[in-house]
Amino acid sequence: MADVYELFLTCPKGLESLLLEEAQGLGLDEARAQVSAVRGQGSLEVAYRLCLWSRLANRVLLVLARFPVENAESMYMAVHAVNWEDHLDAGGTLAVEFSGKGSGIDNTHFGALKVKDAIVDNLRERSGRRPSVDKVNPDVRVHLHLDRGQATLSLDLSGHSLHQRGYRLQQGAAPLKENLAAAVLIRAGWPKIAAEGGALADPMCGVGTFLVEAALMAADIAPNLKRERWGFSSWLGHVPALWRKLHEEAQQRAAAGLARPPLWIRGYEADPRLIQPACNNIERAGVADWVKIYQGELATFEPRPDKGQTGLVICNPPYGERLGDEASLLYLYQNLGERLRQSCIGWSAGVFTGAPELGKRMGIRSHKQYAFWNGALACKLLMIQVEPRQFVTGERGERNDEGLARAPSEPARLSEGGQMFANRLQKNLRQLGKWARRDKIECYRLYDADMPEYALAVDIYGDWVHVQEYAAPKSIDPAKAQARLFDALAAIPQTLGVAQERVVVKRRERQAGKKQYERQSSEGKFLEVGEGDVRLLVNLTDYLDTGLFLDHRPMRLRIQKEAAGKRFLNLFCYTATATVHAARGGARSTTSVDLSKTYLDWARRNLSLNGFSDKQRLVHGDVMEWLREDDGQYELIFIDPPTFSNSKRMEGVFDVQRDHVELLDLAMARLAPGGVLYFSNNFRKFELDESVQARYAVEEITGETLDPDFARNPKIHRAWRITVR
């Protein structure tokens, strides 16, 4: 065996420079960094120290050979030429990992198989015995990397990846790997802060990875001290006495570190389900005297160390994957900035984020940013010195008396565009607010893409705000579109005086196929709102639409005025809001037809909320099929079909432009003498067929069915009054 080995350390992308410094400190000579790795030379003792003490490496590989590869056979011969009796007992177990490609080897499974065959054949030829394969816990794990015709053959001394310290058996939804968490702490300056007796707090600690890694550093505990099985444990080149010496030395250092007065290291987590797993992880790591976890919301975060010392606030805020998460993320960062400004003066803060653009919403300048990768996600560590001179805040948004909630909102610093958007909201609120108060309207559209660069619809639902982002055209840079959305979301709470958590955001785009019916969420929260003298249920979170088409408000009120004593038919009834108005107006009976059981259940709730049930008929079925079979007569009919509709419960696809003639003919056959049919749809390119106008008395009433909040968008729908000639 050689006295000095070539050693190859792998690590996550972005940690190379930190690992280089760490490896040099542990004795690696001639060290140099490359992508996701550090290579150098060292003795077996250095290799052992790297395995035991590296907080950043994934694996420690001992290089056995480097050689050119022309084809699979030349690779086989080069691997076969290694004296494997120095490394593996012929009756032992083996695992082979292969990475890279080239020289006719484009399949890693095939490459690994050729390497395995070469090793097995070598040992069988020398001893008459052959090793078996064990992919989980082999005696020796061999790795071959092929890059541009050059192969590196290595032994994996670490075994399982070194980030697996053994303490984190329970984890949350999106945990950081332990070595990435350690790297973030090192970049954030924790080793120096800890050496000076400083404190550490994580306001969103999850299962406590930052906390444990911080305690291991502060107490001088080798990160892999408790690992029982190593890649070198059954390697024939292993020197147990040397390993025991280094392991005992690490145990003594850990004991000395834990004997010191513990630093103040605290974590706070809002999700009660994560508290016990976090405590279990801390206990397994052996740092329960150093680390404490408390359940607490970010809004109450206020670190107060026993001795009044400052230190480091470190956190990894969640990043959103679900449509509509933008608002909650924006407000989370604003709240984090608020807590830092109010409760952490004099502290350093490190915010590790996959959405660095949100860091600007904290209202504190970051003086340093470090690039990292969390798997395939590009991330940044934003370093902040929490001092008033670093604060960036704007003026508190002007409050209003338009009937919106008075919940205070921490003012966010608005960009120039964000301030323009806020100004437009205020202008619209002054104009529409008077009308809404006069007519006792709780729900209305405040803003509808008035400024093209802010392509949003902003709807008021009592003291809630429902925001729909229109999908940007492909010609628009997605990053710019997202930045504008964030500008708008920052402006809305302070301009309208609503609590941040009462702003709901969705993205509206052209619907296709089943997507029109997809749930956006599953919160199941219904909000009761008023429209005239009826109460209606809306759901702002679960579906793209809320259950109440605001643009049809005048039509519903017209139906209520005309319904007295009449039989009312509502086709494609959705949540039957028009039916509720008809019933309130004194309709003799109501019949509402829709293909969705979900919306019919919603309709039943709306009717029940207003005290209607027995006389109101709800029909689950395909409207066209139902009309062909129904023989009832109705004095008042309302039809507001979707642009298209498909379902496994109906044959074919309903297309309003193609099918409206048949639909209207079927419905007019059900119209009682002297009755009125109201027909509306929101297909912007819709043209009413001339044959309909020839057969019936048709009057377009679109202008009469638009209130001031939709006057800016006259194409939101079209409506007709149709009677028998």
From Swiss-Prot:
<dbReference type="GO" id="GO:0008990">
    <property type="term" value="F:rRNA (guanine-N2-)-methyltransferase activity"/>
</dbReference>
<dbReference type="Pfam" id="PF10672">
    <property type="entry name" value="Methyltrans_SAM"/>
</dbReference>
<keyword id="KW-0949">S-adenosyl-L-methionine</keyword>
<dbReference type="InterPro" id="IPR029063">
    <property type="entry name" value="SAM-dependent_MTases_sf"/>
</dbReference>
<keyword id="KW-0694">RNA-binding</keyword>
<comment type="similarity">
    <text>Belongs to the methyltransferase superfamily. RlmKL family.</text>
</comment>
<dbReference type="GO" id="GO:0070043">
    <property type="term" value="F:rRNA (guanine-N7-)-methyltransferase activity"/>
</dbReference>
<keyword id="KW-0963">Cytoplasm</keyword>
<dbReference type="InterPro" id="IPR000241">
    <property type="entry name" value="RlmKL-like_Mtase"/>
</dbReference>
<dbReference type="GO" id="GO:0052915">
    <property type="term" value="F:23S rRNA (guanine(2445)-N(2))-methyltransferase activity"/>
</dbReference>
<dbReference type="Pfam" id="PF01170">
    <property type="entry name" value="UPF0020"/>
</dbReference>
<dbReference type="GO" id="GO:0005737">
    <property type="term" value="C:cytoplasm"/>
</dbReference>
<dbReference type="GO" id="GO:0003723">
    <property type="term" value="F:RNA binding"/>
</dbReference>
<dbReference type="InterPro" id="IPR002052">
    <property type="entry name" value="DNA_methylase_N6_adenine_CS"/>
</dbReference>
<dbReference type="Pfam" id="PF02926">
    <property type="entry name" value="THUMP"/>
</dbReference>
<dbReference type="InterPro" id="IPR054170">
    <property type="entry name" value="RlmL_1st"/>
</dbReference>
<protein>
    <recommendedName>
        <fullName>Ribosomal RNA large subunit methyltransferase K/L</fullName>
        <ecNumber>2.1.1.173</ecNumber>
        <ecNumber>2.1.1.264</ecNumber>
    </recommendedName>
</protein>
<keyword id="KW-0698">rRNA processing</keyword>
<dbReference type="Pfam" id="PF22020">
    <property type="entry name" value="RlmL_1st"/>
</dbReference>
<dbReference type="InterPro" id="IPR017244">
    <property type="entry name" value="23SrRNA_methyltr_KL"/>
</dbReference>
<dbReference type="InterPro" id="IPR019614">
    <property type="entry name" value="SAM-dep_methyl-trfase"/>
</dbReference>
<keyword id="KW-0489">Methyltransferase</keyword>
<feature type="domain" description="THUMP">
    <location>
        <begin position="46"/>
        <end position="157"/>
    </location>
</feature>
<dbReference type="InterPro" id="IPR004114">
    <property type="entry name" value="THUMP_dom"/>
</dbReference>
<comment type="function">
    <text>Specifically methylates the guanine in position 2445 (m2G2445) and the guanine in position 2069 (m7G2069) of 23S rRNA.</text>
</comment>
<keyword id="KW-0808">Transferase</keyword>
